[in-house]
Curated annotation (Swiss-Prot):
Acetyl-CoA binds at residues 367, 373-374, 392, 410, 427. The gene is glmU. UDP-N-acetyl-alpha-D-glucosamine binds at residues 13-16, 27, 80, 85-86, 108-110, 145, 159, 174, 231, 320, 338, 353, 364. It catalyses: alpha-D-glucosamine 1-phosphate + acetyl-CoA = N-acetyl-alpha-D-glucosamine 1-phosphate + CoA + H(+); N-acetyl-alpha-D-glucosamine 1-phosphate + UTP + H(+) = UDP-N-acetyl-alpha-D-glucosamine + diphosphate. It comes from Jannaschia sp. (strain CCS1). Transmembrane segments: none annotated. One of its GO terms (cellular component) is cytoplasm. This is Bifunctional protein GlmU. Its main location: cytoplasm. Residues 255-454 are annotated as: N-acetyltransferase. InterPro entries: Bifunctional_GlmU, GlmU-like, GlmU_C_LbH, Hexapep, MobA-like_NTP_Trfase, Nucleotide-diphossugar_trans, Trimer_LpxA-like_sf.
Amino acid sequence: MQATPRPLALIVLAAGAGTRMNSDLPKPLHTLGSAPLVAHTIAAGASLEPARLVVITGHGADEVEAVLQDIAPEAVTARQTPQLGTGHAVLQAAAALEGFEGDAMVLYGDSPFFTSETLQAMRIARAAHDVVMLGFRPADPGRYGRLVMDGDTLRKIVEFKDATPEEREITFCNSGVLCADAATLMTLLAQLTNDNAAGEYYLTDVPELAGNAGLTATAIACDEAETIGINSRAELVRAEAQFQSQRRAALIEAGVTMQAPDSVHFALDTHIGRDAVIEPYVVFGADVTVESGAQIRAFSHLEGCHISAGAIVGPYARLRPGAEIGNNAKVGNFVEVKAADIAEGAKVNHLSYIGDATVGERANIGAGTVTCNYDGVMKHRTDIGADAFIGSDTMLVAPVTVGAGAMTASGSTITEDVPDGALALGRAKQVNKPGLATKLRARLKAIKDAKSKD
């Protein structure tokens, strides 16, 4: 019988200044896949079902902590002031983990690509060792810290500048990710010294301290692509390309059809069902779900919305937060939908704005329809019943209700509720003036000619 895994605490380091980003925004809040970098790290760790989440903040702490309230309200934060190295940063979690009986895993808020499989492998290795580090074998070891192994035992981590010629030949390098018993880790961290050129306390000293204390340390390997950290704008650009490539491949493998995958942009939390079709140049912002069999046509932009099975969106559609598109509904070209429910089988085929509204089943919204939902201070709702027909160029001045099976005449401005089955006409009577257009043109031309002579 498989043993129950020990409780786990995630410690996410998000305190660095990120000076190479050349930005007023704290580095953990720069976006990748429409989500803050730190959100990627938390999402990877969430697959391990941690009992506690501790995020170490520092530079821009107020901003980082405010974002954490939205993306991870369960997180406990601890501030590192001043920033004195990675070991010092992890030690700031001691108070939050007081009395915690379980393991602690250290992750980084600027390293978004560690997979749940790799992190789970660390937990498995932890069952046989007191300290587990995560290593990788890069194509170019360069100036990475080296993992000095003796068989299965990790003796120490040596920085490149301090390594002997023999140690520099080692190709097994340090990613910085660590897993250990939480109490043991805090005990070892308390023994760190800052006897180095930077005057900082390094997490990389923990394996050697563990060995000195009679504990065992080891390291497991992951793919180099998982270890990428982001320290500059250029690295963020490369990371975005890597993220998008991975998401496209994963969705195609899961049964999503993409006609030009390199032109489609996904977010961290994009969910798409199999047999959905995504045409070229579609952008998915945060919080979008597309159900099986739906079709998203070219040049559409979606965020904060849900598209049900069989629905068709676009081309050139914009779905904003709160848009709910029902089964087999259609939202066509140059249509914007916000905070609105488009029910099953309804059609909004072109050139319309539908906001703060409900559109009933099988209703048909004509071209140029606008729900006039904002009075300059407050938003108001428009409710359109099932099987209603809204004529082209109708202005629906909210709050207003159009009943089931009702119709509005083209060009109408609707300011009052329309009963079920009624036809509403809200436009001025047309009056034709014979010959007046010819006279008006002649008069205007004479005025223009007179001005030209002046």
